[in-house]
Amino acid sequence: VENIVIGHMEVVACADSRVSFNLVLTPAETVAYGNLPFDQQLVLCEIITHPNF
C-alpha cells in the first residue's frame, strides 16, 4: 500500500500556546481526498503544542 500525500501545510497561529496546521487542498486534490478509502483519509486540521509560541 502506497502512502498518498496531497495538499500542502499552512501554519496558522493560535491562542493558548498552540499552533494550528491546516492542510490546504486544490480542487483536484479535494477530489482525490474524497476518493480515498475511509481508513486512509487524512485529518485536515491538527492542533499541537508549540513550546516557542
Curated annotation (Swiss-Prot):
This is Unknown protein from 2D-PAGE of needles. The lineage of its organism: Eukaryota, Viridiplantae, Streptophyta, Embryophyta, Tracheophyta. It comes from Pinus pinaster. On the 2D-gel the determined pI of this unknown protein is: 6.2, its MW is: 25 kDa.
